[in-house]
């Protein structure tokens, strides 16, 4: 058993370390001043073989990534997996990981004094639309935990903006179901995160599909919150997301 555990550690750790090193060394530090509010973010440019305009990929981190250092957000589960998927599939893309400030959350639903930061993310997206000529039919939104909830709220507040989305372990509390119909969305929860969350997402997914939307949901067997947010970003799910193009 000790030999098996050692072998498992050897096999898993290099993969995790390489993803972490890639995200820290490949994503350039950037910031944008928006009428007194500084939006800090990291950005990677992925150059595929195609000459087509780049897709824009936005990742929203979880609660532990909040701050002002423009680094804590890079610990977000899934960043490395998304980046490596884009690279290995030769997808021209700008991948942006904004940092939510300490006093905010993406959706504004984390506490009584909480301030939503998604409007600034939308303005960051608009900046790249006007300044870089990205492919506006291929803007993708992904996030985990607090960022998963942020995904749902951005789909709610800005329908028609995104080609597709993936929300890992984040709920859609307070969202207007009709607004969510515009965007194909894949969501996940771990089974150890609770039946209430899973049942709510099953109900929402069924409603969206019944009313002309496109939604998928998977309950990840035996996984707790931290495990589920890491396991959500598989190649198969990312393939589903990036196969979509806004009509």
Question: Where are the model-predicted features located?
Answer:
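A domain-start/cap signature at the N-terminus of enzymes
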Residues: 17-56, 93, 122, 142, ...
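C-terminal catalytic histidine-bearing segment of alpha/beta-hydrolase fold enzymes
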Residues: 184-247
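The conserved beta1-alpha1 loop
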Residues: 60-62, 189
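Alpha/beta-hydrolase
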Residues: 58-60, 168, 220
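Gly/Ser-rich "nucleophile elbow"/oxyanion-hole loop immediately N-terminal to the catalytic nucleophile
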Residues: 47-52, 104-145
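Primarily recognizes the serine-hydrolase "nucleophile elbow" in alpha/beta-hydrolase
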Residues: 130-131, 137-181
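Bacterial Sec-dependent N-terminal signal peptides
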Residues: 1-23
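Active-site machinery of serine-nucleophile hydrolases
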Residues: 56, 63-118
């Amino acid at each position: 058993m000790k030999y098996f555990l050692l072998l498992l550690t050897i096999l898993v750790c290099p993969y995790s370390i390489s993803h972490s090193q890639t995200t820290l060394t490949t994503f350039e530090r950037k910031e944008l001043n928006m009428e007194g509010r500084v939006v800090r973010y990291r950005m990677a440019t992925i150059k595929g073989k195609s000459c087509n305009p780049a897709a824009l990929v936005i990742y929203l981190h979880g609660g532990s990534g909040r701050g002002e250092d423009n680094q804590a957000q890079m610990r977000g589960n899934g960043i490395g997996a998304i980046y490596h998927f884009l690279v290995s599939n030769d997808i021209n893309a700008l991948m942006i990981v904004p940092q939510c400030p300490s006093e905010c959350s993406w959706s504004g639903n984390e506490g009584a004094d909480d301030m939503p930061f998604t409007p600034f993310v939308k303005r960051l997206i608009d900046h790249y639309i006007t300044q870089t000529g990205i492919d506006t039919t291929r803007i993708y939104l992904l996030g985990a935990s607090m960022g998963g909830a942020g995904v749902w709220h951005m789909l709610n507040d800005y329908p028609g903006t995104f080609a597709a989305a993936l929300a890992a372990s984040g709920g859609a509390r307070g969202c207007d179901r009709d607004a969510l119909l515009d965007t194909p969305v894949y969501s996940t929860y771990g089974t150890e995160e609770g039946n209430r969350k899973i049942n709510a997402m099953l109900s929402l997914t069924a409603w969206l599909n019944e009313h002309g939307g496109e939604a998928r949901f998977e309950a990840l067997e035996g996984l707790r919150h931290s495990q589920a947010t890491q396991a959500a970003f598989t190649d198969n799910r990312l393939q589903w997301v990036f196969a979509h193009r806004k009509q």
